[in-house]
Amino acid sequence: DGFGIGWYQKETDPKPAVFLSVQPAWNNLNLRSIAPKISSDCFLAHVRAATHGHVSETNSHPFHFGRFLFMHNGSIGGFRVIKRALRMRLSDSIYDWIRGETDSEHFFALFLERLNLKGEEITCESMAAALRGALSDLKELLNEHGITTPTFLNVVITDGDAILATRYAT
């Protein structure tokens, strides 16, 4: 259902480079060509098994915003039921950033909404607080809508310096 890689070349740009494809990674000639040329202190790779959204590069991970990379494995139970309410919690700028249909990208948007993107220094601690806040928002949405379908989130977020990973289940 696609794959993606994201990496940082901080000498040239603090924002990550991202390569996405709907082809299987083992069958992608472009990946075979660029992989030996990539050198990075921070590298994420994701193979997608679609649960929400069609197979497209737009729905492939890792998602990126500014200097952040995000990838997720799992699914948000009842996502279609809570999707509209989740979007109502987003500022216009974060809402407009969403390009795909996945529960993953929407959860990343909740994280970004919780993160202070107004120019203050972002630390590992503030990223962790934003992740906890996004999980709290998600739990609240699931409870408000009476969702009992299990949610499984295995999440990795990085800004190229700090890496956060969590496993969450309802």
Q: Regions from the language model: what does each represent?
A:
Residues 1-72, 77-170:
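Conserved short alpha-helical segments that host acidic/polar catalytic motifs at enzyme active sites
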